[in-house]
Regions:
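C-terminal catalytic domains of large/alpha subunits in multi-subunit enzymes
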Residues: 12-266
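Conserved strand-to-helix beginnings and helix N-cap segments that scaffold or border functional pockets
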Residues: 7-8
Length: 266
């Protein structure tokens, strides 16, 4: 988790798969002695890839509990301390975790999940499936241009994004707001010039005062491979923002900007 809320989403997904409250989870992250190498945080892959692994882990742990308690798949599972109960139409079945012989690492019951999205390389005709799924989105920007000073202010952005299935609406909207903020910086102010942009006085970044009004529309077209139909929303929130802003500038002034950022001199 690098700030996008992946830890919360992983727990939510696993809790749903296992069938217990997320409050019963104790998340361990970044411990190479306990956690497997799941790859890097990039390419909108955490909810889709790691989330699917979390779902599979929860489902496998639930299957073990169901088998141990000898209850139906519809059983409700509850845990309090070392007591695990599974209740279905036949009654309530109690499992005392301390009565179970622990594994070498001290764990009593475990569920593990891995997910490697299916892909196929491009053939000689450039046909194939290099990625398991794709994100889609569209943004519209309303801008105000001062033709005397050459400055641009973004007034409003409407963003519609297909997220497959929304796991955590607040975090999804926050991710889109963050992408738009980065896109705003890309479009209007962020530029690195060697020996000039040496600090944040010379390398400008958006502040809360630069942010426009944002309207987010979440489109849910479930992705069969993703956890409960979800897919990532990382780059997809950033990519359309600058083109939308530049389109607004051209519509207002007739000037096409071909080099970012769109500073007054350009």
């Amino acid at each position: 988790d690098i700030g996008q809320g992946a830890n919360t989403v992983m727990v939510q997904i696993c809790a749903d798969a296992l069938g217990i409250s997320a409050s019963k989870f104790d998340l361990v992250m970044g411990d190479t002695d306990l956690t497997a190498d799941a790859g890097k945080t990039s390419a909108s892959r955490q909810t889709f890839v790691s989330g699917k692994a979390a779902q599979l882990a929860g489902e496998r742990l639930r299957a073990k509990i169901i088998h141990l308690a000898e209850v139906s798949d519809r059983a409700a599972i509850h845990i309090e301390g070392e007591k695990l109960t599974a209740k279905d139409e036949t009654g309530e079945h109690l499992i005392i975790l301390s009565d179970i012989l622990p594994q070498e690492n001290g764990d009593v019951l475990t569920g593990e999940g891995t997910f490697d999205p299916p892909t196929t390389p491009l053939d000689e005709n450039r046909q194939g499936s290099p990625y398991a799924t794709y994100g889609f989105g569209a943004q519209i920007a309303e801008v105000e241009v001062d033709t005397s000073l050459g400055t641009t202010k973004v007034l409003r952005i409407a963003a519609a994004h297909d997220v497959g299935k929304t796991i955590n609406p607040t975090q999804v909207e926050g991710q889109i707001h963050g992408g738009i903020a980065q896109g705003l910086g890309l479009a209007l102010m962020e530029e690195y010039i060697q020996e000039v942009s040496e600090n944040l006085h010379d390398y400008l970044m958006p502040t809360v005062g630069d942010m426009p009004s944002i309207e987010v529309m979440l489109i849910e077209d479930p992705e069969p491979l993703g956890p409960y139909g979800a897919k990532g929303i990382g780059e997809h929130a950033l990519i359309p923002t600058a083109p939308a802003i530049l389109g607004g500038i051209k519509h207002a002034t007739g000037v096409a900007i071909h080099h970012l950022p769109a500073t007054p001199d350009r």
